[in-house]
Amino acid sequence: MTVAPVYKQGWTLDDVHWSLFDPKRIEPSLLATVKAAALVEYNAPDYVTYLKRVFAGTGPETIAAIEQWGREEAQHGRALGRWAEMADPSFKLEEAFARFRKGYTPEHFDGSDDVSVRGSRRGEMIARCVVESGTSSYYSAIRDASEEPVLAEIAGRIAADEYRHYKLFYDLQHAQPEPELGFWKKLSIAVGRVRESDDDELAFSFYCANVPPEQEAATPYDRKKFSKLAGRASMAAYHRKHIDRLVQMVVKAVGANPHGWLARLAGILLWRRLETRSI
């Protein structure tokens, strides 16, 4: 039985065993999804700016934690991008990211409002828990699916970070001096954030990462088309256990039993939804 390594917080790109890279073991669908993921992770500074506005006045420790989270997320993007550049020398992280940033910026990132788009700081942290649940399970799936050793290591390191980020936001949710949100309100926020996975962020990042600039005219961006392609590439890595873990973390964030009926039902529905998106 192989025991997966335990990756601690605070790693850098120098800790990754790049010399073990094996181009013969690259899986094309994983390469496509890693390219897109690199752009999303590398976009962390915008999220940091937004969260610092929302949490202004909460104290230096909270702001420092948000800034540290952002540094780690951006590092994830650099690590994934470096691997993708090794796997496909035609891919350039900075060039693809510039195209992505030019075409994708959520409205609440551009504003100056210090109120969360979720309605409260607690609501914002529930949404962040949903995201970290998704990324933790996603990189766990890539780690388990990859036969290329460097990608498996990077994905394992990122998955461990994302789980720690989930715990950070879970604790911050309960630390806010705001009224406790009701269960149905929390569930509504969580479901709403899950549905946002159909927005332009994932589809457009997949487009920018996998369609070279010189092919833009022949292959224009179509959200529905590239959302489906992104979903298909992701499903190549996922197994049901990864979805079940994701759902358990989300259900815990909204205050329900992570091993109860809601988690079981949500796991079935989400798995079916992902299968449908990838067809």
What residues fall within each predicted segment?
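Non-heme di-metal
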Residues: 1-279
